């Protein structure tokens, strides 16, 4: 069984996230996808929406499972629950949990190309590569040589870091938060399920977007 993990702050989740996950799934053809919003990211100062609301907004990913050729998809609140209990979130711990709960499964981790360039800063990054294969969604923006050089440095033997080409969508959560704070709806960038939660809760209004 092949399981593809896709994590992030998802503050808010947007169509670029869906596009990246679709590309990663098409690259490795998993039997199951697990979308995991972070409780508290080690790389960010905080999130604008609570873990519970980001988890609710991530239900928008379920639409991918209805597309031809896509596997079942689970939106997991495990990291959000860990953070609520006072635990620090690290990707390697999530992968270890998935490995325990799915003995014999082949694990994949989908990340963006910017994350690969900073991968050595991840907690126990060597163990991440031991436990899972990393699928990098790579946009055609001229950074391919640097990405492949980085992959060779991190994984000299090859086979643990894969690339999934993806059409670049010009959006980032920080930019969307700023536009939402200015009163825009961002209909082209945000699924209706996400916009519905934002409207209901009044999220991102009169707040500055902090980090992507």
Each language-model region and where it sits:
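Nucleotidyltransferase catalytic core that binds NTPs
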Residues: 1-212
């Amino acid at each position: 069984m092949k399981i593809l993990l896709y994590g992030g702050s998802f503050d808010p989740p947007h169509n670029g996230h869906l596009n990246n996950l679709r590309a990663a799934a098409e690259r490795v053809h998993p039997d199951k996808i697990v979308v995991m919003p972070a409780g508290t990211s080690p790389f960010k100062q905080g999130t604008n929406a609570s873990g519970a609301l980001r988890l609710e907004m991530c239900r928008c990913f379920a639409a991918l499972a209805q597309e031809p050729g896509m596997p079942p998809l689970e939106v997991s609140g495990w990291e959000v629950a860990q953070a609520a209990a006072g635990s620090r979130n690290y990707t390697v711990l999530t992968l270890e949990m998935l490995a325990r709960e799915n003995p014999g499964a082949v694990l994949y981790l989908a990340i963006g190309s910017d994350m690969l360039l900073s991968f050595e800063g991840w907690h126990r990054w060597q163990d991440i590569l031991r436990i899972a294969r990393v699928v990098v969604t790579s946009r055609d923006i001229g950074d391919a040589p640097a990405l492949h050089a980085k992959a060779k440095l991190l994984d000299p033997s090859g086979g643990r870091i894969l690339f999934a080409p993806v059409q670049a969508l010009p959006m980032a959560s920080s930019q969307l938060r700023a536009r939402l704070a200015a009163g825009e709806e961002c209909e082209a960038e945000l699924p209706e399920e996400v916009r519905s939660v934002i409207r209901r809760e009044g999220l991102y209004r009169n707040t500055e977007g902090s980090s992507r």
